[in-house]
Curated annotation (Swiss-Prot):
Gene name of the record: ylxM
Function: Might take part in the signal recognition particle (SRP) pathway. This is inferred from the conservation of its genetic proximity to ftsY/ffh. May be a regulatory protein.
Name of the protein described by the UniProt record: UPF0122 protein SMU_1061
GO MF annotation list: GTPase regulator activity
Top-level taxonomic group: Bacteria
Species annotation: Streptococcus mutans serotype c (strain ATCC 700610 / UA159)
InterPro entries: RNA_pol_sigma_r3/r4-like, UPF0122, UPF0122_fam_protein, WH-like_DNA-bd_sf
Sequence similarity: Belongs to the UPF0122 family.
Length: 110
């Protein structure tokens, strides 16, 4: 499994998990976060390996579709980069430090 894809799926899952069914959440979490194999997930849920594979592929597409429409993850990445740039350029500015702190709390970055 590609590490970039795994990281992306885990990130998208963090943003959009609430929009998935319980089965989709379980399969994606076990496969990407817990590193279960398709066979292990199939055994756990008493379904075929092919059923797990199909569900995971469908769910990956759903997560990508949510991101394409809502941009929550990509917007978060941009905000994080802006926060980091401000903190680097103005490390001693208490006003900006305070505002960044508020925004990061809202953004759940901590």
């Amino acid at each position: 499994m590609e590490i970039e894809k795994t990281n992306r799926m885990n990130a998208l899952f963090e943003f959009y998990a609430a929009l998935l069914t319980d089965k989709q959440m379980n399969y994606i979490e076990l496969y990407y976060a817990d590193d279960y194999s398709l066979a292990e997930i199939a055994e756990e849920f008493d379904v075929s390996r092919q059923a797990v594979y199909d569900n995971i592929k469908r769910t990956e597409k759903i997560l990508e579709d949510y991101e394409m429409k809502l941009h929550m993850y990509s917007d978060y990445v941009v905000r994080s980069e802006i926060f980091d740039a401000i903190m680097k350029k103005y490390p001693n500015d208490p006003y900006l430090q305070n505002k960044i702190s508020i925004l990061t709390t809202i953004d759940n970055r901590d």
